[in-house]
Amino acid sequence: EKNIKEDLTEIEINPHVDPNITFGVELECSHKLNTSYIALGTLYNNWHFKEEGTVYNGVEITSPILNYTNEDMKRLKCICDFLNENGFKTTKDCGGHIHFGFDYIESITHLQLLYYIYVNTEEILSYMFNKEGTILREGAIANAPFINENILNLYGKYIQTYANNLKSFATLLGNAQKDRYASLNIKNAFSLDKNTIELRIPNGTLEFNELNLNIILFTRIMQKSKYF
């Protein structure tokens, strides 16, 4: 087994991403010695290894809270390198979930615009959030179904709402998606445990470059909807 090595070289990060946006990744994958890694529990600065029951020999690696900084992105790259060098693989059953800090959302209008961008381009985004030349995994139909039909039927193209505060609006959007299994999951918003909005549509990947692109794309949507 190769060790996790801290790569001291600088990596190229997108200068337009707001480093104040927090995020965390859930890397679903498979390994023939999955139980051994799960037994370790934690590796490398609080990255957690736990069982992933939806994947054969499944392991889920969850990150600590990260920011889009050179230091944190180097840590993400080190984990990806370690997994790739030690026999971890993604399968057709793996999803790639990324949580983004909901505290970045400051107003009803900000959330309206984020959903306006997302639900009106959801099908296109489902391709953009996945590696070029790949198709959306079959499991996404059950574990990350599109939300656009439910949201648009309830709130219209411009996501109109009579909610009088951000928390109640987030709750209404969460009710519209029915359960947490949605391409964009807002049910964690305002929870004490995990105040996030979760992107669930990407296929599973252990490729740093793909994760980086997905983080950039969604954080830029969050930023543009704030300053639109």
Residue ranges and their predicted role:
Residues 1-90, 103-228:
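C-terminal accessory/tail domains of diverse enzymes
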